Amino acid sequence: MYRRAAVLRTLSFLVATATLGSPPPASAAEADPTGGDPFRSFQWPDLRREFLGTAPVEFDPRVKVSGPVFAEDAMNVPISVSADGLQGIEQILVFVDRNPIRKVLEYFPAGERGTLPSVSFRFKLQQASPVRAAVKTRDGVWHVGGTLVDSAGGGCTVAGETRKDGSWSKSLGEVSAKLYPRSVAPGAGDAGAGAAASRLRLRVMHPMDTGLAGGIPAFFINRLSLRDAQGRELLRLNAYEPVSENPIFSFDFANPPAGKLQLVGTDNNGNRITGAVTGAVIGAVE
């Protein structure tokens, strides 16, 4: 009997010691290697640290990213980003989980001058991946949305058409643009709800080389700025290698900008980009 009691006391001590020495149970966030990512992407924790740092982050349905379910042309994947329900937007950052070059562009709309928080463009996709937009508001919070795009891939590691035929140098830096009316002003908010909205669609001729195709160094537009007739900046865009060749960008405004607009920019080789568009709207866009 005494031996049995001694054994039981010993077992009780060992159990208590093991319990005291074991770590506390992990929280749900700690146990999830994707950091709570809606796409369950293992790249997300690293992406958050790389692009968003230690700032607070929310997965927010008000940040809408639209793209094809399957991209037939991996060198020209259309993406539209809008954050109509958010106020006080400072920056929109677009990045791709599984691209060899993850950052696509940074967009800075001047909301106080009627520029809406929306942008459309095309980019190169290397393989199926979540495509994300992170929207920073004045309170320092990043609001994140995204969409999953499937693709056969390879868009980042092949040369563009104008690079293949050598025609890129003949049109380098040429700008064409039109301003169209829109019947609805998405996200007009304080900028003027119910106003006649407009969309600016512009193209800049440039090969936008990623540097990942054999023998072709990185060569891409890195900055564009649109200014009104008074020289005030309406928007600024920092582009990176994944943006498609001869990029086309679309920007929305709560009201048609008056007078002549001026586009200025540079590429990573220091070439200057300049172009003008009249404030008069032309035609119509759906």
Model-inferred region functions:
Residues R203-P217:
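Short amphipathic, basic-aromatic surface patches that mediate peripheral association
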Residues E112-V119, E241-D252:
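Aromatic sugar-binding surface patches on proteins
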Residues M75-I79, A196-L200:
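Structural beta-strand segments of beta-rich domains
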Residues T137-V144, T266-G275:
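Short acidic/polar inter-strand loop motif in beta-rich domains
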